Amino acid sequence: IRAVTVGVRKNNTLNTIFSKHFEKYLPERTVEVPLAGANLHEGAFDLEIRATDGSLAGFGQGNTRTVQMAMRLDTQPPRISVKTLPPNVRRGGAAVVRYTVDEDVSDSGVLVAGYFVPGYQQKDGSYICFFPYPYTMPAREYKNSVEITATDLAGNVTKSRLTVMAYERTFKSDSLELSDNFLMSVQNKLQHLAPQVANPLDCYLYINNNVRAANAQTLREIGKNTAAAMLWSGAFARLPRSAARAGFADHRFYNYQGKLVGESYHLGFDLASVRNAEVPAANSGRVVFTGELGIYGNLVVIDHGLGLMSLYSHLSDIQVKVGDVVQKGQTIAHTGSTGLAFGDHLHFGILVGGVEVTPLEWLDPKWIRDNITGRLDASNAP
């Protein structure tokens, strides 16, 4: 390459912004072209690149080729219009927002204390986003930490406060004494989760802290594998003929020999029925995970679309595979005691944007009508 010229063409006028001749004729060149002198304004323009090689063609002038590339200068952030009324959301629960954006975007959604939950574009061009209210956040903090955001194809970002009506919810708290027999039973059962830890107490604490945190991150990644449409309808169904043994966000403190050594939150419902009871899909959807996952043991996760998923763990067996489309009530597994569980039961959970929220809301047809489907229907009305 002997020479390169770059110009901006707009309204049939060419403004040359870069021109350089090279002493060495290399087959490939990388150049930086400053745009400061281009005098560009918002809108479309053509970037014209002319390159001349070092051959003797044209009486020694070389061969020249010109390429034009259609470009567009965009420095304006996208505009978001929220179509749903401000949601009412309780601590540990979930909410929905429908919105439109005035241009194509690379991503959009809701930020909850900096955690991004994507919205999904619908056939009518609007976006729907289910987003969580983390169980650890006070209402006054949560309502000031929810934002709606969008990034256009040029990288311009808009971000604004999303009005939410946040309410507190209380959760149960327990203090449990860890016995040596219990710690030994955990180590004997789950040593493979902490192979480098020899002490039974340290083994339990490693599983309760490190493995639990790693499992939560895995669930967030699983939560990204979702359909852009609602795959479910109606209230979710709980395990038939079951009794609740533990609730969502139960705060457990663990003592050993009278000293506090750890804590955890129980992020789901523990439901006990008969031994090896059939586990039905709580609603229609697509299976996105099956297999063993740390404290959850044998686990099935079903995607219901728009980042909403149901979770079934401690299973004795699994009767579906990833990719299966399941219907509400279809048997997907049997209850068991795999993972960090003692006694046959089902741990049932709900994920929104990869974050576990209380299943109670999704089991309630009135809550779904008032807070999800009714709001979406109203926002879509002409």
What are these regions (language model features)?
Residues 1, 42, 139, 211-212, ...:
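Solvent-exposed, acidic/flexible segments
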Residues 1-126, 130-140, 146-172:
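Surface-exposed loop/turn and intrinsically disordered segments
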Residues 24-28, 75, 156-256, 371-382:
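Polar/charged, compositionally biased leader and regulatory segments
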Residues 27-29, 79-90, 127, 179-191, ...:
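Repeat-unit-sized solenoid/scaffold elements
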Residues 95, 146-147, 194-196, 359-363, ...:
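A general structural signal for short secondary-structure boundary/capping elements
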Residues 109-110, 173-177, 360-362:
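Short, charged, solvent-exposed linker or helix-capping segments at domain edges/interfaces
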Residues 125-126, 135, 213-221, 348:
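A short, terminal or domain-edge coil/loop segment
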Residues 235-382:
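Catalytic cores of peptidoglycan-degrading enzymes
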